């Protein structure tokens, strides 16, 4: 959530920043007008309450002195009626201010391409050599089905489209990949967490999914209370410290977790209808950081490095891009996407998004620390995929496919596959 005080102090700057995220200036004007009226009503209410207290004291004295206090009692009733009316207006103003404020995205960082067009995202650099084949490279879904390690047809029978069965060597490969990821993150100082896969509405609000993106999630009820299947481990990891004060000496705090992610993919009809790229349920290893504000840009680079390191050890070519302002996530001030090369598609596809959310999530979730002066400050939060497991499997199948239909297993994964170096039809 944005700092309303900052918007109040720098309204034109705020409008310019948010215009790059498709927010109209009129919305900011409305917010500020409501905020101004709210502050006026607050002052009026406090003045009337003070007056009521004074009159109440006068009435008590007059009654002790057996004086007639009818006029004062009448005046106090009138003041009470005015207070009730102002309290009602104040509640309505609070609701309207909150409604607008919680739906405003984070301010984009200064070095982000300021554009409403995702095509204006900026490529920063590339890594690795794209594989060359003396045959037409196949799509990962064709490879997986022919090897008998991916079964989309039976998954559709059981659950519908955008689901898959991993079988045999495919299941072992998926498990090998995420165990490799977790081990590497542990070496880099991340604490592994196994979090809840169902979270309450306050948690979804804290990380910015609610109220704006309720249509993109799956929700159930438990004893009448709604619980949402997590769209990413970012939600339970960030909310670990919701309404909490972190010891400054512990910062930065680094968490990692493997969880399934559940997404309705609303608005994705017709996109990536085959394969592992866009699923309703998929495994993902997430990285989350909590740090002091002055450290967050350095921590973003560390986050990107930790995601890149996995791709480099897997030998998968990729590039890093800085997303245009309106293509970044709702909570992000800056997002760098890592996109892995997919030979059959002849294009890069996202495999990790690394974001600095500055104090946006911490303000919503009330996550703070005490600075050197003992003053409470909001931490900065960062998150990144490290990595999306299904997309990693897809990229391994495509980049390591062989002419005979088999798939070579990346060297770093072989120990996690009990020494198996390739997946063949017989596996």
Curated annotation (Swiss-Prot):
Q: What EC class is this?
A: ligase
**GO CC: one term?**
cytoplasm
Pfam families assigned: Seryl_tRNA_N, tRNA-synt_2b
Give the reaction(s) catalysed. Answer: tRNA(Ser) + L-serine + ATP = L-seryl-tRNA(Ser) + AMP + diphosphate + H(+); tRNA(Sec) + L-serine + ATP = L-seryl-tRNA(Sec) + AMP + diphosphate + H(+)
GO MF term list: ATP binding; catalytic activity, acting on a protein; serine-tRNA ligase activity; transferase activity
Query: Could you list the residue ranges that cross the membrane?
Result: none
EC identifiers of the protein: 6.1.1.11
Keyword Plastid attached: no
Give the quaternary structure.
Homodimer. The tRNA molecule binds across the dimer.
Recorded protein name is Serine--tRNA ligase
Species classification? Bacteria, Bacillati, Bacillota, Bacilli, Lactobacillales
Gene encoding it?
Answer: serS
